[in-house]
Amino acid sequence: MARRYDELRHYPGITEHTTALASFSEAAPSVPRAPGPYTPHRPPQLQAPGLDSDSLKREKDDIYGHPLFPLLALVFEKCELATCSPRDGASAGLGSPPGGDVCSSDSFNEDIAAFAKQIRSERPLFSSNPELDNLMVQAIQVLRFHLLELEKVHDLCDNFCHRYITCLKGKMPIDLVIEDRDGSCREDLEDYAASCPSLPDQNTTWIRDHEDSGSVHLGTPGPSSGGLASQSGDNSSDQGDGLDTSVASPSSAGEDEDLDLERRRNKKRGIFPKVATNIMRAWLFQHLSHPYPSEEQKKQLAQDTGLTILQVNNWFINARRRIVQPMIDQSNRTGQGASFNPEGQPMAGFTETQPQVTVRTPGSMGMNLNLEGEWHYL
């Protein structure tokens, strides 16, 4: 039996627990217990059928007086500490030496070596009852396996926290998405302004100004700069000329090159073809008074653009938020003299015979333009 215990796996020993283990083994049977159904290292006070109190007390004394009971109590306490005590990844797990944690499996193996060295000098490891010896060894092994599983859980938690913190310190993918969306919005406004020459000068100026401010995609126009606006207007005009030529003469010599460039840009950013967006923009600015296509109109637009009805619907939702709503907000800031006219006419052109124009945008209140040129919320 002694050789069977010696064949168990041991780790490097420690000596600080020797005195505590020796005193614990001698005093364990006579330690007073607090009243209650459960006490530390004791089973519930239940009496099995057919056993009197004397025989039950005798069996308890045999367990508490067994040479391996102090080791059983020690591993049980380590399991409790590993379950209840807070664990810091800086002191245990990541980058810490083996056995550095008092509740780790390495420290328990060190305690086994110290306990075996101490107990052999005093008395044998096993008693005269083989059944009780087997029970004690199996109980220690079960708690040992439990301690190993707890340590695995702690290591996984430490590893997850380390990887999560490392990920937070890096650049978030949302930053790349925002940068790409800013560039997409500016290009959409450039193409749209160039493809709609019938827009009033004030609306074209608004688009140029807000292209420089970089706040169009949020719907909050910023202050414009004269030099930047002029430069942006020149660039927009150049791009608009190329776009008009491409649409008016599809069989031109540079069409293939433009299509290849467009395919590469679409593949990189995942946007719709420029021809399709031009068709939908034209419809949007022809129906600014009510930029909500019906189901039949969506089907027709889907056929004209080669997109699905869902893609057409999503594009109009984004366009009302990114184009129509900022134009309405800008017209509210400029005042009555430069109010936004959905039909592209100056405010002085309204007469008493003209109906009121209502502009509704998703996620906001409707706005009513009366005959006096004033905006009212519906």
From Swiss-Prot:
Biased composition (Pro residues): 32-43
Compositionally biased residues, Low complexity: 230-244
GO CC, alphabetical: nucleus
Record bears the keyword DNA-binding: yes
Annotated stretches, region: Disordered: 24-57, 203-265
DNA-binding region listed in the record: 265-327
Tissue localization of expression: Expressed at high levels in the brain. Significant expression also observed in the heart, spleen and lung. Expressed in pancreatic islets (beta-cells and non-beta-cells).
Localization per Swiss-Prot or TrEMBL: Nucleus
Gene3D superfamilies to which the protein is assigned, alphabetical: Homeodomain-like
An MF annotation (GO) of this entry: chromatin binding
Predominant cellular place of this UniProt entry's protein: nucleus
GO biological process, one term: negative regulation of apoptotic signaling pathway
Keyword Nucleus in annotation: yes
Domain MEIS N-terminal: 99-182
UniProtKB keywords: DNA-binding, Homeobox, Nucleus
SUPFAM superfamilies documented for this protein: Homeodomain-like (SSF46689)
Protein's job: Transcriptional regulator which directly modulates PDPK1 expression, thus promoting survival of pancreatic beta-cells. Also regulates expression of NDFIP1, BNIP3, and CCNG1.
Family as reported in the entry's similarity comment: Belongs to the TALE/MEIS homeobox family.
Name of the protein described by the UniProt record: Homeobox protein Meis3
Species per Swiss-Prot/TrEMBL record: Mus musculus
